[in-house]
Amino acid sequence: MDFPYPVGHAFPLFLAPMAGVSESPFRLIARRFGADVVVSEFISAVGVARGLEHLFHDMRFEEAERPIGIQLYGADATVMAQAAEMVTEACNPDFIDINFGCPVKKVVKNNGGSGCLKDLDLVQRIIRAVQNATHLPVTVKIRSGWDDAQRDPVAIAQRCREAGARALTLHARTRTQMFSGKANWDEIARVVDALDIPVIGNGDIATAADVVAMRAHTGCAGAMIARGSFGNPWIFAQARDLLAGRPVRPDPRPEERFATALEHARLALRLQGDTRKTALEFRKHLGWYTKGVPGASQLRERLFQIESMQQAEAIFTAYLARDAVEQAA
């Protein structure tokens, strides 16, 4: 079955929508390393409807990021429809994705995100309202249920399909699980069997091999990578190697990791325009990019104190110089 937007490969790889991570700079990096489709951070429909300028700034993207979806969350069908119409006019992404999966307390306390899963009639009203407000394809991201007592991903997925969802991503955990325990890939397989639209698998993809394993286990139409991409955009290229039957490219050496981190930082600074703010917000990314390199803990200790990316670059340069001396000794 076909996706309602261009995907580039028979089995597309998606960068998941993640607050504070799936911003335009990292989306560009992920696309360069092989992500077929990217999705924005989740955006408040209420904020969009109110015309909050910073949200429209957050939704900006470059043509190189396409295909891209803008993800909206909210619990009021009328407001969601208004926001979808405004996003369509202002941004014209390739699709609108509805967030029925976010487990964060500040979102679900107003029945947004996975809070909507407690009321499947509301889920359907939201999907129909958004679909009627835009000419763009409408897709959804769900969890397996609110809790174990209400865990029924097939029923949730079928209701979404009935309401008009054109593709569906399942994170195979409940809201109460948050990110604990294991994602139940068997549930993804059951949803795949139950629907006639593309089903994207999500949950517990930490390596390229996990992508191949998920496809084999579930029969999903694509894989969405979330935390496995943190500081690791190479996961997309390595997964594509495996899917294509090619030898898998090796993990990057420290110099490649550092160069990519700095490229990511330059993109972030271009978007942010504030050297110190960019550096402070980028510390988490530096921690992820340096995971697994020799002496990582001492390196991160220094990187977590930077107040400019020039300081980070100097730290990386000194690290590589010491490494070269040690290898020559």
Residues covered by each model-derived region:
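Alpha/beta catalytic cores of nucleotide-metabolism and tRNA/nucleoside-modifying enzymes
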Residues: 1-10, 14, 19, 24-25, ...
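Glycine-rich, positively charged N-terminal anion/phosphate-binding segment
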Residues: 1-9, 18-94
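N-terminal small/glycine-rich loop or linker at the start of catalytic domains
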Residues: 2-14, 48-67, 102-112, 127, ...
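Hydrophobic faces of well-ordered beta-strands that scaffold small-molecule active sites
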Residues: 13-17, 38-40, 68-72, 96, ...
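Active-site beta-loop-alpha junctions enriched in small/polar residues
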Residues: 18-20, 43-45, 73-75, 101-103, ...
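Alpha/beta enzyme core
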Residues: 81-112, 120-197, 217
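Aromatic- and acidic-residue-enriched carbohydrate-binding clefts of CAZyme catalytic domains
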Residues: 117
